[in-house]
């Protein structure tokens, strides 16, 4: 976002404020939907690098909106935060020792911004680009790191999951949580 603001003449960078508005507008939309009688549910994940960037830019408009989405008890049943990597690194190309470091860096920054209680509510993990390691050893270490860091579930693309016999999931199975075995 900062690069977009500083270089408005390049590509779509003139849209920097539209991006900033998107980062903060859910703090307006979710309460409005609740006031209208709806029961919205959304899952959000922002990389640690993005959160840090908002701080470095002094974007209190965005930070205040995120603070509300994370910490307002009235919004907590409607907004589920997911952990992710500190940077936007994709798991298949991240060195194995760095997987856990990426996870821990995000957790530490999220807790520093929003408090330990907010971090304790984060149960799911969203890997950048929903990429999972193809190599079984890397996938094992990735899942191991997630479990060691307290995550209970992982957001994946439905075609990434199959039945134990190798058959694809039925439509009904794809819409429900699945146990990793």
Placement of each model-derived feature along the sequence:
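Well-ordered, non-membrane alpha-helical segments in soluble/globular domains
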Residues: 12-29, 58-69, 99-104, 137-145
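Acidic-and-aromatic substrate-binding clefts and catalytic sites of carbohydrate-active enzymes
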Residues: 50-62, 90-99, 127-137, 161-166
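Alpha-helical scaffold elements lining the catalytic groove of polysaccharide deacetylases
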Residues: 89-115
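Active-site-adjacent pocket scaffolds in enzyme catalytic domains
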Residues: 131-181
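N-terminal regions that are enriched for targeting/export leaders
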Residues: 1-38, 42
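Conserved beta-strand positions
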Residues: 46, 127, 155-156
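Conserved, mostly hydrophobic/aromatic
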Residues: 84, 125
């Amino acid at each position: 976002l900062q690069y977009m603001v500083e270089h408005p003449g390049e590509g779509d960078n003139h849209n920097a404020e539209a991006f900033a508005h998107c980062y903060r507008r859910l703090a307006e939309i979710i309460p409005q939907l609740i006031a209208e009688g709806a029961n919205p549910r959304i899952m959000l994940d922002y990389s640690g690098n993005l959160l840090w960037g908002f701080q470095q830019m002094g974007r209190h408009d965005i930070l205040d909106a995120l603070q509300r989405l994370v910490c307002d008890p009235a919004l907590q049943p409607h907004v589920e935060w997911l952990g992710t990597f500190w940077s936007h690194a994709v798991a298949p190309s991240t060195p194995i020792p760095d997987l856990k470091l990426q996870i821990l860096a995000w957790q530490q920054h999220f807790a520093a911004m929003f408090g330990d209680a907010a971090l304790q509510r984060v149960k799911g993990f969203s890997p950048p680009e929903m990429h999972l390691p193809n190599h079984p050893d890397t996938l094992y270490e990735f899942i191991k790191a997630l479990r060691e860091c307290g995550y209970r579930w992982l957001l994946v693309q439905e075609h990434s999951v199959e039945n134990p016999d190798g058959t694809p999931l039925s439509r009904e199975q794809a819409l429900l949580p699945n146990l990793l075995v």
